[in-house]
Amino acid sequence: MKIIIILALIAIIGTLIAFKSAKKVHTPRTEFSDSEYETHSQLKLDGIEKVLGKSHDFVGHAIIPFNVGGAVDMYYFPNGIKGTGFATLELINPDGVGPIKNSIGTYELVAFTRNPISSEKDSDFFKIERRMCGIFTSLGFYTKTARIEPRETCEVPQNEGEPNICLIFDEYAPNGTHFTIGDKKHGLLLVIEIFPEEMCYAMNNGGQKLLNLLKEKGHYPYSDMNRKPVVSK
């Protein structure tokens, strides 16, 4: 089992060197018009609502936009499965380019909590929402340079003295309903926070076996940690 160690929010400065070549190389676009972004964003929201249910009117906009180094915007989906779904809508560009493709293609990130949506800062919802925003942001930057697959595990480093966050991934396509943007098929990569001993179990036995245990115990696809581990140390 491959473990991915994410170094969050690292600025990488590169020098671009042009070489002559007889073969034409496709260069992804880096700039899009407001109209392109607006149309693409609406198609993306329409597509993700078909999987997660109608989104909440409120959006958690970052003070510093993700595309210039800030946090991701958080979108909330309280009308699907019990609780609230979280999703990113900024990883895939209007030209379809986004995270490095994995077995489900290019994708956005999703996660779930059993807590109902709440704006109270001392609520359990607010705490897990802020935690998941940090996880999504770290992963969002990392996926630009590395491939992440369903059933893999991951550790996200935290501040000095704090334990790493352990995660496992899965494709999220309930009842075979896939995420599309217009007529283009993409993917939703489910992020689930797990206990360290659960990650060790996945490393030794395979991620699918851990996912099966989480489903058997009724914890899938949620990231709430007010539960007991499904495996012993």
For every predicted segment, state its role.
Residues I3-L7, I12, L16-T88, G96-I104, ...:
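Acidic, proline/glycine-rich low-complexity IDRs
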